[in-house]
């Protein structure tokens, strides 16, 4: 029975975005939950940029207030603290991951604004479930609406106005962010997503299109995209039932996906990419969750280099859950890219990485 309870707890925490949050306050229609994790881990790799201590901690809260029987206000904030920096470096590399607030109108959906996940990640999240790696062929932080990003206004509707269980859709607008780094900038854009889940099976699709900033267009080079618009479309399938998790996604991007780095340390932006991800996992009752995945991103029309693989690896890993709060993991990223003139020019890593760690979460 105890082993079965561990499996149920693990399944629940994997399904929930915020794991086992501690309820700080719940009175008179106001609720505040605190959550966090300490992720103690080390990478082993011949790539000096990847090898070493990667420890960090995260802390966040989720709050909501019942305004009336039809209207609820909510907000969420999440911050990451690096644990592999010297004390003299202070908060260098620490970051705000999420910060948004919104209103939920009963069955009519919710609206929020701030730093949040782009709607394209509604599909990308299905394969971003590996013990440590994964979700890196096209879902990227601060790259338009493919991952966590800033200045997004999002409308979400669950169960299609309460009429069709499992049918969800979202619409999103992102305002212009013109930053120093062209690869993290974006113009005005919009995105759409829709998913349907029934008895463990899920199918979904997403699309987003944005203007590119003048600096992004002007940065065009042999390896940098020159298009005026950035686009992504993605589709996914998944099965999540009976302790089995299977998921696959396919996507294409235009003038969006970043890779490698130039002499100044800035990432290149590919003209076009075709991306495939697939993952399979099984949750044993005694807490072990083995995982295997394959991921590939092919860059198209990369100047004089033509078509090149940007990402390709097999991932083999496992997580062992002592209980819902404590786990340990190992994750082996078997890089299938070979050294070439392209990987050297674009500084694309071809080395394997092994990650091991302990994770405490509440």
From Swiss-Prot:
Keywords: Cell outer membrane, Ion transport, Membrane, Porin, Signal, Transmembrane, Transmembrane beta strand, Transport. GO terms for biological process: monoatomic ion transmembrane transport. Residues 1-21 form the signal peptide. Its main location: membrane. Disruption phenotype: Mutants show increased sensitivity to methyl viologen. InterPro entries: Gram-neg_bact_OMP, Gram_neg_porin_domain, Porin_dom_sf, Porin_gammaproteobac, Porin_Gram-ve, Porin_Gram-ve_CS. It is found in: Cell outer membrane. One of its GO terms (cellular component) is cell outer membrane. Homotrimer. Belongs to the Gram-negative porin family. Forms pores that allow passive diffusion of small molecules across the outer membrane. Required for resistance to methyl viologen. This is Outer membrane porin protein OmpD. It comes from Salmonella typhimurium (strain 14028s / SGSC 2262).
